A protein has these predicted regions:
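Short amphipathic alpha helix immediately N-terminal
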Residues: 22-38
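C-terminal flanking helix
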Residues: 63-72
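Short, Lys/Arg-enriched anionic-surface-contact patches
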Residues: 7-27
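General nucleic-acid-binding
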Residues: 1-6
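Short alpha-helical "recognition helix" segments of helix-turn-helix
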Residues: 44-49
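Key DNA-contact positions within bacterial/archaeal DNA-binding proteins
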Residues: 54
Length: 73
């Protein structure tokens, strides 16, 4: 599930910081910010975090609905 995010970087950053919680949340927040705010590709993020592209995509797609829901409220 991929959404077009038409919100300010500040609002996206706040939603990610406030609603991405749990195990490995810090890493997941950084990955989401790299992609949705800084515009890095999944390949660039995977290299940066020493992960596979598949892992990065899974983190992004699994967590996207969580913070997107809070952008709409």
């Amino acid at each position: 599930m991929k959404h077009k995010i038409n919100d300010s970087a500040e609002n996206v950053r706040n939603a990610i910081d406030n609603y991405i919680i749990g195990f490995k949340a810090l890493r997941n927040r950084e990955i989401l910010k790299d992609h949705y705010i800084d515009g890095l590709t999944f390949e660039e993020i995977a290299e940066k975090h020493d992960m596979s592209v598949r892992q990065v995509k899974k983190i992004a797609y699994d967590n996207e609905p969580v913070f997107i829901e809070h952008l709409r409220t």
